[in-house]
Amino acid sequence: MGALNSLPDEPQYVGLAEKTGFSFEQIGILHKRFKQLSNNGETLRREDFNTIPDLLCNPIRSQIIEAFFDRRNFRQTDAVGTVHEIGFGEFLVVMSHFRPPSIRLDDEQKEVIRMEKLRFLFNMHDTDNDGTITLEEYRHVVEELLSRSGALGKETAKGIADAAMLEVASISMGHMEPDEFYEGITFEHFNKLLKEFEIESRMNIRFMNMDTTTLCK
């Protein structure tokens, strides 16, 4: 699965750096974290993430863990389904979705990164890969993004998220016929709903005391 036998040498770093945007130094740091999580093994399984204290109380803990084993997040063309274990390459690619964008990017590059992060967020909640997420899942996304801004308390963020969910429900279902079934929020709708959110700097997680907000050039 692309696992690396030892600390990646420079030629391997080049490919990984180009694919993920991480610097050689950052890749080295993440490789050490990978080895710690895998008990110095070559692959990671879902159970290896159960030892991470910062994930234990996260309300979307299961979705975060599952995201590491979702082929859609490996930046491979038309990849679907899940895997039982991942190597360092896959781990690094998924981690790059949580990496804040470089301040040196132009507007077009920033938009590409924003869309990648939105797709990653959507995939995280679209667990059955049917192209839609539920209103409740959308509420979770909004609450998480607001909570991570640091400007709002947890209860305030929850209240705003509840209101956002109800607003989407009223708009979506208000245009439906009585016999129609609400199929959920598509990615296109999801993108429009979150257009006012600055998700680029709010998607971060901690792994064994390593904050991904520090992993920017």
Q: What are these model-derived regions, one by one?
A:
Residues 1-125:
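EF-hand Ca2+-binding helix-loop-helix modules
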Residues 49, 64-73, 90-92, 102-128, ...:
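EF-hand and EF-hand-like helix-loop-helix modules
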